[in-house]
From Swiss-Prot:
It is an enzyme of class 1 (oxidoreductase). This is 4-hydroxy-tetrahydrodipicolinate reductase. It comes from the Bacteria. NADP(+) binds at residue 38. One of its GO terms (cellular component) is cytosol. It comes from Bacillus cereus (strain B4264). The keyword NADP applies.
Amino acid sequence: MKEIKVIIAGPRGRMGHEAVLLMERTEHFNLVAAVDYKHGGEKISDLPGMPALHAPIYADLHTCLDEVEADVLLDLTTPEVGKQHVTLAVERGLRSVIGTTGFTEEELARLTENAKEKAVGTIIAPNFAIGAVLMMKFSQMAAKYFQDVEVIELHHDQKLDAPSGTAVKTVELIRQNRESKQQGHPNEVEQLAGARGANVDGIHIHSVRLPGLIAHQEVMFGGDGQMLTVRHDSFNRASFMSGVKLSIETVMNLDHLVYGLENIID
């Protein structure tokens, strides 16, 4: 396979560290630079726990893109920074794979239009774990037969956004096969505000944040005399790397924006 030159934004995070290791062990990936505002001017190998890769680190993406030739930007930063980076990447005509979440429908629509206009491949993935993507697809299928559903997502206590992008994407897919319906008793009253979680078109999403967790989600469907639960668990961040690898390889052949890995797997 042809070499793919990659820039990683956010190499010091746990996902970023795993992505650097992915670069090291994948023959056709070449890590040409990284973006980290705290370590501009250093090299990847200078960071604690990193492999002996000598890709330069830039403090900001603007400077990096001015000085480095790359094929793909892999962004694993924060929602706020990720939005800035994908916008800049599209403007510069650089393909990007975005692992941050928190995009609004309006922001996605604008990015989709811009990527189409520039004919630049872009993938925004709420979850890179292939198992999680299948969980979402299975939930979408089940919603055709089970109209009563709630979502519980559980993550580590350092996660910045709630509900998770995976939960939001799951509900979006379920809504495609489910009539609008308020889940629970029509006259129910919350004795404590927020007790029933977030509400999206009648579907409740419950977010749990605890140390010891990584990324977990279960989608619970109820029916007469039966329950169906679709669950996925990521026990470490290596579980996301197969999806990262697939996304980097796939985005090379795209000329538009794709939201969600379910749209690039068979």
